[in-house]
Design a protein with these regions (language model features):
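Flavin-dependent oxidoreductase catalytic cores
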Residues: 1-282
Length: 282
């Protein structure tokens, strides 16, 4: 009922709404969160406690996850969502299968790019078989740390995703080893992750979406370059929920910009476990 309420409120104003589905953080989970080692693709060290080894998912675990993705997609469909996004980003569990730095498996889910992508493509197929909604895949194309996946290496992966039936890609950069790119600050500059779009455009024919410190001006430039089809804002809508209405009514000067301090949004949720706010509103 709560999901339906959100969807109906969104549709009431003529907007579309997408449901993001995730199977969790994997090795990025806090070790004390569940009282046992986190799951991952392999027995890699926990991000926040390297002395603790993760528990590799069994094939039975993987089958259960596929069923849960399908069931979640059905819930999203019944609630009225217009699309589904798979969270394969930021070094979370799906990414831990896709990336050789974390995936050390020797079965059909490890080794070659095709095998490492099997977990992700089976998720896509599970959702596609369950519902007739567009499927978006969120992926960081450049991990930005020495052992991580590079932009060039990611091109084969997005080609595999397109062949698997993904309808659009939500792309940027970073992972928890480069957490400054997960919550990009002002120091990283405007549109700090749009550079991944140009190369991706050469390898896929599906729509490309991009986020990361965008301003209205940088968003327009990226769209006009044709390297991306959609530009996304997150924290900007916390700073000024009326951003789009102001832009559409030619009142750009009235937009309250996000200053990317992370103090009252990310800081409240991650650091203080309280409801988010915005320093721009204080």
């Amino acid at each position: 009922p709560q999901l339906t309420t959100v969807v109906e409120a969104t549709h009431r104003w003529g907007a579309k709404i997408c449901c993001q589905i995730s199977c969790g953080t994997g090795r990025n989970a806090f070790p004390n969160m569940y009282g046992e080692p986190p799951f991952s693709s392999s027995d890699t060290p926990s991000t926040f406690n390297p002395e603790m080894k993760c528990r590799p998912l069994s094939k039975e675990d993987i089958k259960k996850i596929m069923t849960e993705f399908a069931n979640s997609a059905i819930i999203a469909k019944n609630a009225g969502f217009d699309a589904i996004e798979i969270h394969g980003h930021a070094g979370y569990l799906v990414d831990q299968f896709m990336s050789p730095v974390w995936n050390k498996r020797t079965d059909e889910y490890g080794g070659s790019a095709e095998n490492r992508m099997r977990f992700a493509t089976e998720i896509v197929q599970s959702i596609k078989q369950a519902v007739d909604l567009p499927v978006i895949f969120r992926i960081a194309l450049d991990h930005l740390f020495a052992e991580g996946r590079t932009l060039d290496e990611s091109m084969e992966l997005i080609e595999i995703l397109e062949k698997a039936g993904v309808d659009a890609l939500d792309i940027d950069a970073g992972c928890y080893e480069r957490i400054d790119y997960i919550f990009p600050t002002a120091y990283l500059g405007d549109a700090c992750m749009d550079y991944v779009c140009k190369e991706a455009r050469k390898h896929v024919n599906i729509p490309i979406m991009n986020a990361g410190n965008h301003t209205p001006e940088s968003a327009l430039r990226l769209i006009e370059s044709k390297d991306a089809d959609f530009v996304m804002f997150g924290r900007q809508f916390i700073a000024d929920p009326d951003t789009v209405n102001k832009l559409m009514s030619d009142h750009e000067e009235d937009v309250r910009p996000c200053i990317r301090c992370n103090e009252e949004c990310v800081g409240r949720i991650v650091g203080r476990l309280t409801k988010l706010s915005c320093a721009c509103l204080l």
